[in-house]
Amino acid sequence: MPESLQIGMLQMDAGPDKEVNLERIGEGISDLRGNPDIVVTPEYMMGMEDGGVTRELVRKNSEPMRSGYVSKARELAEANGVALLTTAYVEEEDDIYNTSIFIKEDGEIGGTYRKVHLFDAFGHRESDLFSWGDGVTVVNWNGIKVGLATCFDVRFPELFRIMNFRGADLILVPSGFYAGEHKGKQWETLINARAHENNFFVAGVNHPEPHFVGRSIVSSPLGYEVERFGGDEEYGLVEVDLGEIKESRERMPIKKLARHKFYRRFAPYDGD
């Protein structure tokens, strides 16, 4: 594992034109000062309108994984010599998945993740737009194990604990965390908790206000925020000390102390 990592965060809006959004990602990468190792975008980068996502737009903009949109994203990563974590509406047969795509710096796809927990809350029905994902993704990249999650997933610590058990060092969370009463504080609390309770870094990248909470965060396993943006559109480079992962695990060895046999006595849960 390297000593440190430079994470580029693009807290940006997205419009209905997926090609324009992709161009803006490229511009955002160019605007980052320094040398990012990986760049992370928000969720819904394949298209939003009026601060939200509609069934019609998802169907219009969705493409298969081997498509022009994903190919152009791969070209962006390779041209800039950076890894890129972005999102797409990926068609597969009769389904469309809200998919995070980890693209390595050579343009090859390192891994994909289909959003497991769809946002059917606060009056939204994301399951009307997408099919449910059913897998866990941890990518081996340059000596770092990178787990993938998406937005609403942060409310479900089980997914993050599974990635902990699979050895994840860093979780990337592209997000469209909607604004609302107390929502900004909820976002901060959830990202920070998922990092500290699992001995890994978590980088959550969101869309800006007013429709979303902004506040993109990188949280350390030691229990503090390395960086937190404000509410406006913002691009920034965040350096993390990867030695804090080992330090955290030595001080508080969560995976070692977890009582797996005890948990299995009460799982699976078949509640309503």
Language model feature labels by segment:
Residues 20-29, 156-161:
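Short, acidic/polar
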Residues 112, 138, 207-272:
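C-terminal beta-strand edge segments of enzyme domains
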Residues 91-166, 179-189, 193, 250-258, ...:
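Active-site catalytic loop in hydrolytic enzyme cores
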Residues 2-8:
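Extreme N-terminal starter segment of soluble prokaryotic enzymes
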Residues 62-85, 154-236:
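CN hydrolase (nitrilase-like) catalytic-core segments centered on the catalytic cysteine
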Residues 11-16:
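Short polar catalytic/cofactor-binding loops
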Residues 27-106, 178-196:
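Cys-nucleophile CN-hydrolase/nitrilase-fold catalytic domain and related Cys-dependent amidase chemistry
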Residues 37-38, 146, 170:
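Structural motif
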